[in-house]
Amino acid sequence: MSRYRGPRVKIIRRLGALPGLTNKTFKSKSGYINQSTSNKKVSQYRIRLEEKQKLRFHYGLTERQLLKYVRIARKAKGSTGQVLLQLLEMRLDNIIFRLGMAPTIPGARQLVNHQHILINNNTVDIPSYNCKPKDIITIKDRQKSQSIITKNLNFFQKQKIPNHLTFDLIQFKGLINQIVDRECIYLKINELLVVEYYSRQV
């Protein structure tokens, strides 16, 4: 399954706020809340499916990519669900987003693909790159790169940067202090249900 490129409002209407996908919010009219299911008993399968979809759309992943991360998380020590979230949070495109350098994860992915981003002074153009503690993230010293990111920073750094990250507004430099804690992941998600959804596939 390919990455979703359709209307984003349609997704957040169904799944709720997904800040990685879009900074838009959906306000229901006259107390409208998913009328197709409000009077029906929702199956456990559907509940798990929707949690999985939240994760996939928020981080902008294909089905194959998400399944790959679930398999890696299952082999790691610790809670599979929390390890899964840590793997996704430490992707380069997500780190750029959480630092406030891009409005959304798709926007961050575009910055990486267009080679605006440096990690430890080396150009990295792979959005899925797995960042590590002590990695230093900067931008290329060219006018276009700085102009794009300055515009984003001025608007989006009003949001609080999570504790595992630091950003120097003077030097345009981000630092990864540590692996993200569960408390710093602001997406409303039940990761256990995602793991349960994939239990038969991994």
Curated annotation (Swiss-Prot):
Residues 90-154 form the S4 RNA-binding domain. CDD domains: S4 (cd00165). Its main location: plastid. It is found in: Plastid, Chloroplast. One of its GO terms (molecular function) is rRNA binding. It holds the Pfam family Ribosomal_S4. InterPro entries: Ribosomal_uS4, Ribosomal_uS4_bac-type, Ribosomal_uS4_CS, Ribosomal_uS4_N, S4_RNA-bd, S4_RNA-bd_sf. GO terms for biological process: ribosomal small subunit biogenesis; translation. One of its GO terms (cellular component) is small ribosomal subunit. It comes from the Eukaryota. Keywords: Chloroplast, Plastid, Ribonucleoprotein, Ribosomal protein, RNA-binding, rRNA-binding. Part of the 30S ribosomal subunit. Contacts protein S5. The interaction surface between S4 and S5 is involved in control of translational fidelity. One of the primary rRNA binding proteins, it binds directly to 16S rRNA where it nucleates assembly of the body of the 30S subunit. Belongs to the universal ribosomal protein uS4 family. This is Small ribosomal subunit protein uS4c. It comes from Plagiochasma rupestre. The gene is rps4.
